[in-house]
Amino acid sequence: MIHKVIEQWHAHMRGELANGLDLLLDDDVVFYSPIVYTPQAGKAITTLYLQAAGQTLPGEKKEGASSDPSKRFRYTKQVLDGNTAVLEFETTVDGKYVNGVDIITCNDAGKIVEFRVMIRPLQAINLVHQQMANMLEHMKPQSEQFHGA
């Protein structure tokens, strides 16, 4: 099952899967951020975080993204086993190298039930933290419903 989910995930990342997150994420998905200590539960909040990450760590389809392929978000390795995938990624943000992994677990229905992100090195974590905070603040009207503000 994970092979099909990851094929769909890659299609979503390329902008080729309409309503990709809605189709891929289980209603009760749990998102583990490298920045936020508390796991984020639910499709709506996970969608928000993944959309913010998509803006913070731009891929090839982003306007104004570097024409240098080595600076764009890209997956460099993947390991699929059972219902779990580990996808290693690299990118450059504001001249800083970012390396990390997405650990994705799906259920037997083909929905993502857990999404973990880990990032290195420390300067990348600090940069992504700052940019994610700015992006979430920009998305605040949408995010307030999730944080009870």
Label every PLM stretch briefly:
Residues M1-A149:
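C-terminal and inter-domain tail/linker signature
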